Amino acid sequence: MDYNYLISAITGYLFGCFQASYFVGILVNKIDIREHGSTNAGASNVTMVMGFKWGVVVAVLDILKGSAAVWLSQFLFPGQIEFAFIAGICAILGHIYPFFMKFQGGKGIATLIGMFLALNWRSEERRVGKECRSRW
């Protein structure tokens, strides 16, 4: 068995298990974000419960978490994109199903965006630009 797949999967999952929404809720308002609003441990619920500023902070941290999992895998296994994909997908799964929160996490959208940005940021930049132009 090639242990590189396992290493990528475990590191990606552990990156994903870091729940920024939970820690921001505890540190800033001393609340468990899963007990307020939509009861979802994600950036959208933080925005509803704690305000736009903290929602943006959580979203950025979740995006960075998805990107960091991919970047670490690309650093450990240069030129082997399959390990980066595995790390990114497992980071999303870790965000949705974190083991230390009884497998109740967020929806994984910001982590998915972070994974896409790390894998091919030029393509994502163009997509976001087109989306912004079509809205205004």
Where are these regions (language model features)?
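Cytosolic, membrane-interface loops and tails of multi-pass inner-membrane proteins
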Residues: 23-53, 105
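C-terminal ends of transmembrane helices
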Residues: 21-24, 94-104, 133
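Short helix-capping/hinge motifs at transmembrane helix termini and TM-loop junctions
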Residues: 15, 29, 73, 77-78, ...
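Transmembrane helix interruption/hinge and helix-loop junction motifs
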Residues: 78-80, 118-127
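Alpha-helical transmembrane segments in multi-pass membrane proteins
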Residues: 4, 8, 12, 17, ...
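Membrane-interfacial loop-to-helix junctions in multi-pass transporters
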Residues: 2, 80-86, 121
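Membrane-interface alpha-helices at helix entry/exit sites of multi-pass transporters
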Residues: 42-45, 49-59, 85, 120-124
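Conserved small/polar residues in nucleotide/adenosyl-binding loops
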Residues: 125-132, 136
